Amino acid sequence: MKLNREDVLHIARLARLGLEEDEINRLSKELSALLEHFEVLQQVDTTGVEPTSQSTPVKSVLKEDIIKSSYAREDILSNAPRREGDYVRIRVVME
């Protein structure tokens, strides 16, 4: 599929992009080449191939939560430069 100048300008307007003349010419060629690649892919016989959105086996990367002992709250708070009750007090970053 060959994209002409008007096609590129239409796509640019949809994407809210301002293009220079040289960019329009370059993108016309690049996008046309990209669409030609998709046309080739559309001709591939996929009979018997199950549709998928994942090309590699999906495995859960989540781990079970394990409760481990940690530092005592008072040990941590005793190292804070400033504290307020059971919280570390920091200076205001945004008003």
From Swiss-Prot:
List the Gene3D superfamilies hit by this protein, alphabetically. Glu-tRNAGln amidotransferase C subunit, N-terminal domain
Give the enzyme class: ligase
Query: In the Enzyme Commission scheme, what number(s) does this protein have?
Result: 6.3.5.-
Gene Ontology BP annotations: glutaminyl-tRNAGln biosynthesis via transamidation; regulation of translational fidelity; translation
Q: Which domain of life is it from?
A: Bacteria
**Keywords on record:** ATP-binding, Ligase, Nucleotide-binding, Protein biosynthesis
Role this protein plays: Allows the formation of correctly charged Asn-tRNA(Asn) or Gln-tRNA(Gln) through the transamidation of misacylated Asp-tRNA(Asn) or Glu-tRNA(Gln) in organisms which lack either or both of asparaginyl-tRNA or glutaminyl-tRNA synthetases. The reaction takes place in the presence of glutamine and ATP through an activated phospho-Asp-tRNA(Asn) or phospho-Glu-tRNA(Gln).
Homology family? Belongs to the GatC family.
Protein name, per record = Aspartyl/glutamyl-tRNA(Asn/Gln) amidotransferase subunit C
Q: Give the classification, highest ranks.
A: Bacteria, Bacillati, Chloroflexota, Dehalococcoidia, Dehalococcoidales
Q: Which gene encodes it?
A: gatC
